[in-house]
Amino acid sequence: AGCVAADFPGRRAAEGGRRIPPSELEKIGARMKGSAALWRRYYDETTGLLVDSEYYEGTKWNYSFRLLHDMQGRVELAGGSEKFVALLDRFFGYGAEPVVRAFDPADDTTRAALYDCHRFCGYNNEPDIEAPYAYLWAGRHDRTAQVVRSVLRHNFTVGRGGLPGNDDSGGLSSAFVWNALGLFPVTGQPIVLIGSPCFREASLRVGEETLTIAAPGAGDEAIYVRAATLNGVSLNRAWLTVDELTAGGELTFEMSATPTDFGAEVPPSYP
């Protein structure tokens, strides 16, 4: 109040360049251009890719566990199921202390810990959102349940900054909902994978039908599926076809607090 624009310090500073002779401005510009070449650049200006990397917004680890059409071939490429599981364990930092993301965007402490946790997964990145389900092709539904529940518990909250990154048109929030329901769709494939349902009961409208998902024993400890039925028929595979899901009916889970051998029949691959 009472301050005229001509006296505003910021304006005087902004107008300072007008008082520098053009010849001096050219010299300053040349020096700045020369100094810029000395700065360390992480990105190639011509491609936007990381320097010395052929990957965008990720590494070979982040893109290695996408749910490709031929996942069985991916398992074989790793040297078999056990070695594939070992790679996934390393990717997720399995067995390490969980890192709780910074719920307050101004909190740099937990954010720094997230990047110094000696693991490669970043659940804020789309390629990594589906990676927990790669365990299913090695017959390890229990690992999928462990990782998914850990992600939901430690990376999401209802408070300020409650998502682990940019929602990207609903990508993260919809991933939370799918995971909490105990289902996860596979991009470009006619299957929906079974994870670890959090809700004791949920009803979904699927086209003109209704699908009821019942997991009466679900809880913070009971994260493993012991048995499942679809419309009363036993289901020992950790996946549904899209046609089965959209036909509606009732999908029921019996939950367990200890790992089970549910999901021994691995999802299909399409060579």
Predicted segment positions?
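Active-site core of glycosidic bond-cleaving carbohydrate-active enzymes
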Residues: 2-198, 202-212, 217, 243-245
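Solvent-exposed beta-strand/loop surfaces of large extracellular or lumenal domains
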Residues: 231-241
